[in-house]
Amino acid sequence: MSHSAPPKPATARRSEALTGEIRIPGDKSISHRSFMFGGLASGETRITGLLEGEDVINTGRAMQAMGAKIRKDGDAWIINGVGNGCLLQPEAALDFGNAGTGARLTMGLVGTYDMRTSFIGDASLSKRPMGRVLNPLREMGVQVEAAEGDRMPLTLIGPKTANPITYRVPMASAQVKSAVLLAGLNTPGVTTVIEPVMTRDHTEKMLQGFGADLSVETDKDGVRHIRITGQGKLIGQTIDVPGDPSSTAFPLVAALLVEGSDVTIRNVLMNPTRTGLILTLQEMGADIEVLNARLAGGEDVADLRVKASKLKGVVVPPERAPSMIDEYPVLAIAAAFAEGETVMDGLDELRVKESDRLAAVARGLEANGVDCTEGEMSLTVRGRPDGKGLGGGTVATHLDHRIAMSFLVMGLASEKPVTVDDSTMIATSFPEFMDMMPGLGAKIELSDAR
């Protein structure tokens, strides 16, 4: 879908206690990879709990365009894959809409095939840099025709046979790591990724689960060496996708901020590379109880019981950024209601998300009376524990779903209402948000504000 749909502003107002039990939609990272690896594997893959947001569906469509058979059967998605090395050249450009993850991972997956593959996306995705993924692919022999600055629309022309490479990832990016590993699937020999700072590791865990010959070694300095032997066989799997921790963040922070709240969130992914927000909120004094911790499909999963809490400001260690990069906007909202100062640093990755997310958060906070300072890659927020004087502003969301949801959470606890200029793009990651939150007692509604 393109974001040419008319914008739908929404407003959140101060709410009474939020109570109830919810199950969060499936994790976006695991959902993307389930479609990709299922579409590539031999035999049948069955997925339940898939996040059916537009981003993930676009990844599924791309796999279909390259030969995978995908159908919905009740609550499950059934995929009959093509077999590793057997993707077909798509007849038309692959349209990823707003999905950076889907686009970048698929570039890795198809780049080493001897075929031409074109990628297009919406206005927001077409602004985002793709060079970080294209550079290692070029080293493997892939030719690239791209818009200026290595942006989409772009076309990859694969080599007859790709070269295996050893690639040191220059920034903390799971997408770059994953793209190189996926390119290695169709490359003879061993492709190695060296990762100085660990990022979410779903690609490694899931590829091993599908039968790839992949090993991970961590040296004494914490640097990870990930090796994949190409041209092996992948076998279809059964996957139950756990709830997305990045989506969990919104009802979780809302329950912490709205007085008297007591909310249980079921089936949340607790992979240690994704729990930076929960750790940070607990340091701030959040009452978050981890219940029924268990393993599901090789991933840590648990239920969370969250109660309203008085929060205090903290300094968030910059090395925690990779494990909570998508959660900083909603952490900034929590910080706005915490006593004292919260300092977030090492946020350079936020500048190249769906929007310049760091600037968007700072502008939104200022528009709603929050005392904050934006640095080059940092944000400092000075909180108002009672929410007095906060709210009353309209936030420019810049087509960014996480900005929209974060500021709607803010309005539930601020003295005055908070309006976001558009809520349509929330559907890219959390289509149920606008119904699920009012189900807990949140006062969020579409507004006529222009």
UniProtKB/Swiss-Prot annotation:
Entry binding sites for phosphoenolpyruvate: K28, G100, R128, Q175, R357, R402
Subcellular location, principal: cytoplasm
Stretch forming the signal peptide: none
Pathway this chain belongs to: Metabolic intermediate biosynthesis; chorismate biosynthesis; chorismate from D-erythrose 4-phosphate and phosphoenolpyruvate: step 6/7
GO biological process assignments: amino acid biosynthetic process; aromatic amino acid family biosynthetic process; chorismate biosynthetic process
Keywords: Amino-acid biosynthesis, Aromatic amino acid biosynthesis, Cytoplasm, Transferase
Protein's cellular compartments: Cytoplasm
Transmembrane segments: none
Positions that bind 3-phosphoshikimate: K28, S29, R33, S173, Q175, D326, K353
Active site per UniProt: D326
Reactions this protein catalyses: 3-phosphoshikimate + phosphoenolpyruvate = 5-O-(1-carboxyvinyl)-3-phosphoshikimate + phosphate
Enzyme class: transferase
GO cellular component, one term: cytoplasm
EC number: 2.5.1.19
One MF term in the entry's GO annotations: 3-phosphoshikimate 1-carboxyvinyltransferase activity
Database matches in InterPro entries: Enolpyruvate_Tfrase_dom, Enolpyruvate_Tfrase_sf, EPSP_synthase, EPSP_synthase_CS, RNA3'P_cycl/enolpyr_Trfase_a/b
Transferase as UniProt keyword: yes
Family: Belongs to the EPSP synthase family.
Subunit structure: Monomer.
HAMAP family named among the record's database cross-references: EPSP_synth
Protein's job: Catalyzes the transfer of the enolpyruvyl moiety of phosphoenolpyruvate (PEP) to the 5-hydroxyl of shikimate-3-phosphate (S3P) to produce enolpyruvyl shikimate-3-phosphate and inorganic phosphate.
The protein's name: 3-phosphoshikimate 1-carboxyvinyltransferase
Gene of this entry: aroA
